[in-house]
Amino acid sequence: MGKEKTHINIVVIGHVDSGKSTTTGHLIYKCGGIDKRTIEKFEKEAAEMGKGSFKYAWVLDKLKAERERGITIDISLWKFETSKYYVTIIDAPGHRDFIKNMITGTSQADCAVLIVAAGVGEFEAGISKNGQTREHALLAYTLGVKQLIVGVNKMDSTEPPYSQKRYEEIVKEVSTYIKKIGYNPDTVAFVPISGWNGDNMLEPSANMPWFKGWKVTRKDGNASGTTLLEALDCILPPTRPTDKPLRLPLQDVYKIGGIGTVPVGRVETGVLKPGMVVTFAPVNVTTEVKSVEMHHEALSEALPGDNVGFKVKNVSVKDVRRGNVAGDSKNDPPMEAAGFTAQVIILNHPGQISAGYAPVLDCHMAHIACKFAELKEKIDRRSGKKLEDGPKFLKSGDAAIVDMVPGKPMCVESFSDYPPLGRFAVRDMRQTVAVGVIKAVDKKAAGAGKVTKSAQKAQKAK
């Protein structure tokens, strides 16, 4: 086998009909975790339903339907391999909760793949003022997904087919627009593809002899290639934040007979080890970690990205709950936030938002109503430059710096310190109204919290 490949996460964005599903399906189909039997089954079903032309998108539709129904599907279906990486597609838009997932998502995407359709009139529709493409790309950028690849899809349906002129026109247009969002087009690979026919997906296409390949220039090393697969291979690998203090938002807390209380969650930053004394915020409970488990195996340490359960002593299920955050009691322990300052972008709100508005915030695993206490300034979405002080209200499309106050105790962090705990979605009327990143947190001075006997013992022993 040799050394295991690095895992990376990508998010696929673009307009409804850009051919995202077909393109993604093609990659999974050709390089992925779907076995031949499943594919043959899908092909047979598709043919019976007269969807013979389907193939790749069908694969994805099947997976999506299962995912939406809450069936836990074999997650390997959403994975594929390049020569360097194991790639997981963490979400494909079109899924109802796409925006929310992208923010509170279990993982941060390392790269966004933007698919635009080159067909006559299609590109224009996708990129128009109200096309979703803009929103998705802006969202990816705001949430810290700094690498981008652009697939110019459906090259087989341009006029004439595989038109170099049309491709260049689109590249020019998309470059201008991603630049407005904040991406530097020089660092972005543009690839003319057909997710349907397979042009430039895994093999260089014979239909576009004019395409001399893509190039990216960046300080971490330049790269070039011809296909979409090669572009994915040139994503810069993520650095996992093991050197930061521990932050582990709880997804659940179980009471297990004969074992005791077992909080479960994903290590976002730092390292969790047995014997560590951890503090849970905002409840301010401190205790010793007796053991750490993943997939029923004891671990000597858990690293960022690991979903683990850990056994704690002298803590009842009533003391800690979902949305609490565990950290090292001796190294920048997590604390309750009295309030915080955030940069928000209003995505879709039918009216206007003014001070006092109190929607629900989804931040990591916490789900808590927060009040927009003060609208401090309206800013330019892209540059962050101030446009006006103390605006009276905000509407869709606006970006602003606001002060927020949680309605119940919660633990959040600034995006620059702990990214997964510093981005949030604002939910109201069953949709994502706004997204935000936290600039600064006003931490509440913790009184004497509950320190369990086992924690005191462990601290003395040290």
Curated annotation (Swiss-Prot):
Please tell me where this protein is predominantly located.
Answer: cytoplasm
Instruction: Provide the protein's localization.
Output: Cytoplasm
> Residues annotated as region G2?
70-74
Any one cellular-component term (Gene Ontology) = cytoplasm
List, alphabetically, the SUPFAM superfamilies matched.
EF-Tu/eEF-1alpha/eIF2-gamma C-terminal domain, P-loop containing nucleoside triphosphate hydrolases, Translation proteins
Positions bearing N6-succinyllysine? K392
Residues the record lists as N6,N6,N6-trimethyllysine modifications: K165
The similarity comment for this entry is: Belongs to the TRAFAC class translation factor GTPase superfamily. Classic translation factor GTPase family. EF-Tu/EF-1A subfamily.
Protein name in UniProt? Putative elongation factor 1-alpha-like 3
